From Swiss-Prot:
A GO term, aspect molecular function: mRNA binding
Domain of life the protein comes from: Eukaryota
PANTHER family membership: OS03G0856100 PROTEIN, TETRATRICOPEPTIDE-LIKE HELICAL DOMAIN SUPERFAMILY
Record family assignment: Belongs to the PPR family. P subfamily.
PROSITE patterns referenced in this protein's UniProt entry, alphabetically: PPR
Stretches forming PPR repeats: 130-164, 165-202, 203-233, 239-273, 274-308, 309-343, 344-378, 379-414, 415-449, 450-484, 485-519, 520-554, 555-589, 590-620, 624-658, 659-689
Protein name as annotated: Pentatricopeptide repeat-containing protein At2g16880
């Protein structure tokens, strides 16, 4: 406390006497003394033990002084405030103390002077801050949405070995999890670890906050790990909130088998599923398109006296709309009304969007009118739906007019969804610069880009081969606190593979794991497929093993990528080993898989083995044109024309239509052997099919592993025709044949 001069000491006694008197209008008595009240005198008054015994008087005097003698309050010093707060805390006036701190933080703490005074107390702040002062300041910063500042105070308490109370800790965890930063969850985890070290007794809310944080970031494995720890290590029983949080995250990811297992675990722990639990199940089934099962869950709800609510019906209607069942969706809305459940804006938005999705613009407009008639006010989502469908109809000028109309007439403020819609519209017409301009405009307006928009821009940059820009955008996303996910990294991994930058793709994979983003099967498939395509199948197998160890189940794409990788490397025996082993683990190969293997055998000149495998296939399954084409091509390369013709007849008997690849195999062989008359006949037969085949070129190319490996192979038909034309020209018969090709 500052030392006062003798006159000031006497004045201090006088003012203290006035303030501690029983007079009701004591503040008016102070007015004549205003010119004499200096900053040191004010600090001494606020710290007076006599005045501290009267907290209400102290607060009244403090507020009077702030208005009457503002010059006595230094802008960079919260010491007068701290003096008042100490007094309030000593009398357990916690709400009043917090209110004063919140007001100060809101209006006078731009430079974080309060926080700095607590973190670095000097001689003027005596005694040092107490645990109660730290607690209440931490709580005030959280109230004002500044968990990063509150975290510094918490860390100071830990260094001083002051144990924060549980409520303070849980409030800090909630603030961090809600704060939009890429470091929020890791910071929350550090707070949790400090709570454990310092001996704070944890409760179920502590764990629920962390579980929610992990789920928000898509880190389901970490959430499940926390669930296991709370029971086994900390002996804290999870509640419905714990389970429902994880169930919701699982349902969003479509992990229905895991969801069922967790539901069983929930019941084992004596918890009864509530409406939120059932709604998560309904959502999970709808997400997978299993509408029958979703409706069965609703029936189960009714049987267990848990009535479906508006949320339940909205989930079902959304599921029906996603399945294109608009009539059933509209009927379900009518059923809601009969149950006295009034459709809300979510119900209408879902149905309106569903109608637009199916091209039912008129019905969508009618629903908008019905919505207005029912007194349901259109919201931001409704407007964004309208804009989205204008964009899909490629009416960008109409979109611009619509946005202006909504802003002028309805107070509409473009949000992240609006900008995402506009960005997609620009990208749809190939205007990447326009999309990037929209992204910059978002930043200028302080609208934070969400993960979906970020991924959309990254995908466009990768497709435009602007990988450096894409990588820079990812790095800036981390720095600016954007949430990235496995799709973000998967997009860049695919982009680098497309540009033959295998090492960069692997770096992205390692970085994804470093920031603790859990890859999905799709992400693994991107990596495995890319490695196999670039001749690194053994490394792909390591990633395949990693996938299995992570608890994920490989899908058909995973197995086919490995098989194709081995075949491309000429290691057909290894491909068959993997194929046979995969079948033991529930892999069900389709025609695509079998065609890869058959083509692998043929490419390596193993025609006899290929024929044996082919015969096995036609006995066990309905093969397709590609299967026959592969075998016909092998026979033609071996100059076994009769066997090739036999297969051609066989496939036609089975109703399989020969295509350009079928005939190309024959033409190549016939031309090589100089059999022009047979070539003539085949070309005439082929010319009638040429028109339809031309339209199917892209589809056939994508389907046929035997002919889709390089640009050179894609041009085999053109080469064959060129050879035919050269030969005909040399014999003077081009005019005659050109008539047959164009007739």
């Amino acid at each position: 406390m500052a030392t006062l001069k003798p006159p000031e000491s006497q004045l201090l006694k006088t003012l203290t006497s006035i303030l501690t008197s029983e007079k009701t209008h004591f503040l008016e008595t102070l007015n004549p003394y205003i010119p004499q009240i200096t900053q040191p005198l004010l600090t001494s008054l606020l710290s007076s033990p006599s005045l501290a015994k009267k907290p209400e008087t102290l607060v009244s005097f403090f507020q009077w002084a702030q208005t009457s003698i503002p010059e006595a309050f230094p802008s960079d010093s919260p010491l007068p405030l701290i003096s008042v707060v100490r007094s309030l805390l000593s009398h357990h006036k916690f709400a009043d103390a917090k209110s004063l701190l919140v007001s100060y933080i809101r209006t006078s703490d731009a430079s974080l002077s309060l926080c700095n005074s607590l973190l670095h107390p000097n001689l003027h702040l005596s005694p040092p801050p107490s645990k109660a002062l730290f607690d209440i300041a931490l709580s005030a910063y959280l109230h004002e949405g500044k968990p990063h500042v509150a975290l510094q105070i918490f860390q100071k308490m830990i260094r001083l070995k002051l144990k924060p109370n549980l409520l303070t800790c849980n409030t800090l965890l909630i603030g961090l999890v809600r704060y939009p930063s890429s470091f929020s969850i890791s910071s929350a985890r550090e707070v949790f670890d400090d709570m454990v070290k310092i001996g704070v007794s944890l409760n179920v809310q502590t764990f629920n906050v962390l579980v929610n944080g992990y789920c928000l970031e898509g880190k389901l494995e970490d959430a499940l790990g926390m669930l296991e720890r709370m029971v086994s290590e900390f002996k804290v029983n999870p509640d419905n909130v714990t389970y429902n949080t994880i169930l919701k995250a699982m349902s969003k990811k479509g992990r229905l088998s895991d969801l069922k297992e967790l539901l069983l675990d929930m019941k084992k722990n004596g918890l009864v599923p509530n409406r939120v639990t059932y709604n998560n199940l309904v959502y999970g089934y709808c997400k997978l398109g299993s509408l029958k099962e979703a409706f069965q869950i609703v029936e189960l709800m009714k049987q267990t006296n848990v009535l479906p609510d508006l949320c339940t019906y909205n989930i079902l209607i959304n599921g029906l709309c996603n399945a294109g069942s608009m009539r059933e969706g509209l009927e379900l809305m009518d059923a809601m009304k009969s149950l006295k459940l009034q459709p809300d804006v979510v119900t209408y938005n879902t149905l309106i969007d569903g109608c637009f999705e199916l091209g039912l613009s008129l019905e969508a407009r009618k629903l908008m009118e019905q919505m207005e008639n029912d007194g349901v006010k259109a919201n931001q989502v409704t407007h964004n739906i309208s804009l989205k469908w204008l964009c899909k109809e490629e009416k960008r000028e109409a979109v611009t007019r619509k946005v202006k109309e909504l802003v002028d007439m309805h107070g509409f403020s473009p949000d992240i969804v609006t900008y995402h819609t506009l960005i997609k519209a620009y990208l749809k017409v190939g205007d990447l610069s326009g999309a990037l301009e929209m992204m910059r405009e978002m930043g200028q307006k302080g609208i934070k880009m969400n993960t979906i928009t970020l991924n959309t821009i990254l995908d466009a940059l990768c497709k435009e081969r602007k990988l450096d820009e894409a990588h820079n955008l990812l790095n800036s996303a981390h720095k600016r606190g954007f949430i990235v996910d496995e799709v973000t990294y998967g997009t860049l991994i695919m982009g680098f593979f497309r540009e033959e930058k295998v090492e960069k793709a692997l770096e992205m994979w390692d970085e994804m794991k470093k920031v603790k983003i859990t890859p999905t099967v799709s992400t693994f498939n991107s990596l495995i497929g890319g490695l196999c395509h670039h001749g690194k199948t053994e490394l792909a197998m390591e990633k395949f093993d990693e996938l299995a160890e992570s608890g994920l189940l490989p899908d058909d794409s995973t197995f086919n990528s490995i098989i194709l990788g081995y075949c491309k490397e000429g290691r057909v025996e290894k491909a068959f080993e993997f194929y046979n082993e995969s079948i033991k683990h529930s892999f069900k190969p389709d025609n695509y898989t079998c065609n890869i293997l058959l083509n692998g055998l043929c490419k390596e000149g193993m025609t006899e083995k290929a024929l044996n495998f082919f015969n096995t296939l036609i006995e066990e399954r309905e093969v397709d044109t590609v299967t026959y084409n592969t075998m016909i091509s092998a026979f033609c390369k071996d100059k076994k024309l009769k066997e090739a013709y036999d297969l051609l007849s066989e496939m036609e008997e089975k109703g399989l239509e020969p295509d350009r690849f079928t005939y190309n195999s024959f033409i190549s062989l016939l031309m090589e052997d100089g059999k022009l008359s047979e070539t003539d006949e085949l070309l005439k037969k082929f010319s009638g099919k040429f028109g339809s085949m031309k339209r199917d070129l892209q589809v056939e190319t994508e389907k046929n592993p035997a002919t889709s490996e390089s640009k050179e192979e894609l041009n085999t038909e053109a080469i064959a025709y060129s050879d035919v034309i050269d030969e005909l020209c040399s014999r003077g018969r081009l005019k005659e044949h050109s008539r047959s090709y164009t007739s």
